[in-house]
């Protein structure tokens, strides 16, 4: 990957790994100081996280279901979208970009929605992902686009 420092941490064989990706591209993202297990670290602000997730969803060569899952979560939390991040990726109109996200999601085959997510979520969430995730996310994006002048 370009502009990315990546490493993976595994505590035990067979257990989930922690993957850490650090984007070194200048994106205009805003960061906040957080403490995790007593270790201070800079973490992208909510608005920057949502903008970054939208960019990831639309820029990847292949669909990654966690992008859709995370986008849905962020939208349900009513987080704002950091336009500085989108502008760094040459996005000129938020409304048009959200509409492009809707089109992309509409074209995702239903049979790939659980890929990469199935082992991370419980049965109730799997049912939600299979039956509602796409339509709910599309609805939330359309509502967000509709309130933009």
Regions found by a protein language model. Give the residues of each.
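Structured mid-to-C-terminal alpha-helical surface segments
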Residues: 1-149
